């Protein structure tokens, strides 16, 4: 839990001229802004209606940025010059209003919200990466981590290094009931529990979805509207379908990617949430590299990641190039070059 104890505000006198000032939008700029980055005003004032206009989003972003900076300065025991900060903030506001700069999309959506100030700043991250090489002992936690990040709007990269490191097991299905909490954490925990059942033979209770708010209900923290419990229930069912006939078999790279893609399919159902993922496999793993040749699974969930492979300088690319020519993937990542 994070708590801001020091606020930063731009004055009403400064903001007033911008309320009626024309914004230099392009043909689709305003529509895109209102669709993707404009938050409901009742998040900040229970009596307000409608959603932010650009001047209000700029206010939220700039005040959030400087409040975060102010907290950091005081945390380090440094000197805070409010007059200097106000001058810089006003210049930043004017430049943002006139589209001379913008923060990342995550910043436009999340900066200055109670979610970032009181819960986690992870919602500001653009991307993250998680290796599956320690899948044999971390199990479902790895995919829970990915799901949590995706639900925060973070793009997630992952690899297939965990392939062959564990054997799928029969879960211990119990008659206990788990009422899934109506929160991001509740959804993630249920998936973690189910996957550990198949990865470690752990106990899996019956899931009760009754506490999850109905479709269309407002989400006050992250923003947007609820998709209801249907996408989560479908994810549980899809994961069971994926693993139930593989008990006794080693987990494959395809299983790893399918699991993440099914999670991404669930996350994308959540209105304002996006699901961007990048998978990286071995250059000689044909089953992985041909995953998107299956149209039925591609349209169901395998669209959920861009699939690339670890390319080796000097290798024969003929087969891979033919695959890329056919469907645009796989992508090529030269890690040796990226690290230098």
Describe each PLM feature range.
Residues 1-340:
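Extended catalytic cores of very large enzyme megasubunits
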């Amino acid at each position: 839990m994070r708590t801001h104890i020091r606020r930063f505000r731009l004055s009403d006198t400064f903001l007033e001229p911008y309320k009626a000032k024309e914004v230099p939008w392009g043909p689709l700029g305003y529509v895109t802004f209102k669709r993707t980055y404009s938050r409901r005003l009742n998040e900040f004032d229970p009596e307000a209606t409608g959603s932010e206009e650009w001047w209000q989003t700029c206010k939220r972003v700039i005040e959030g940025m400087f409040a975060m900076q102010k907290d950091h300065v005081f945390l380090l025991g440094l000197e805070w010059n409010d007059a200097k900060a106000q001058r810089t903030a006003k210049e930043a506001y004017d430049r943002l209003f006139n589209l001379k700069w913008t923060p990342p999309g995550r910043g436009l959506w999340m900066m200055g919200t109670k979610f970032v100030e009181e819960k986690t700043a992870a919602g500001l991250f653009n991307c993250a990466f998680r290796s599956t090489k320690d899948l044999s002992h971390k199990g479902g936690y790895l995919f829970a981590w990915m799901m949590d990040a995706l639900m925060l709007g973070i793009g997630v990269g992952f690899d297939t290094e965990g392939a062959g490191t564990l054997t799928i097991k029969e879960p211990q299905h119990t008659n206990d009931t788990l009422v899934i909490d109506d929160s991001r954490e509740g959804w993630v925990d249920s998936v973690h529990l189910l996957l550990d059942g198949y990865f470690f033979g752990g106990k899996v209770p019956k899931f009760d979805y009754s506490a999850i708010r109905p479709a269309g209900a407002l989400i006050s923290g992250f923003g947007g509207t609820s998709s209801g419990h249907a996408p989560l229930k479908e994810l549980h069912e899809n994961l069971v379908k994926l693993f139930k006939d593989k008990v006794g078999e080693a987990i494959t790279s395809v299983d790893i990617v399918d699991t993440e893609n099914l999670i991404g399919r669930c996350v994308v159902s959540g209105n304002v949430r996006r699901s961007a993922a990048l998978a990286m496999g071995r250059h000689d793993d044909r089953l992985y590299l041909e995953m998107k040749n299956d149209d039925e699974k591609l349209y169901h969930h395998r669209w959920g990641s861009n699939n690339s492979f670890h390319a080796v300088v000097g290798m024969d690319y003929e087969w891979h190039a033919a695959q890329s020519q056919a469907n645009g993937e796989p992508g090529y990542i030269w890690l040796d070059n990226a690290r230098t």
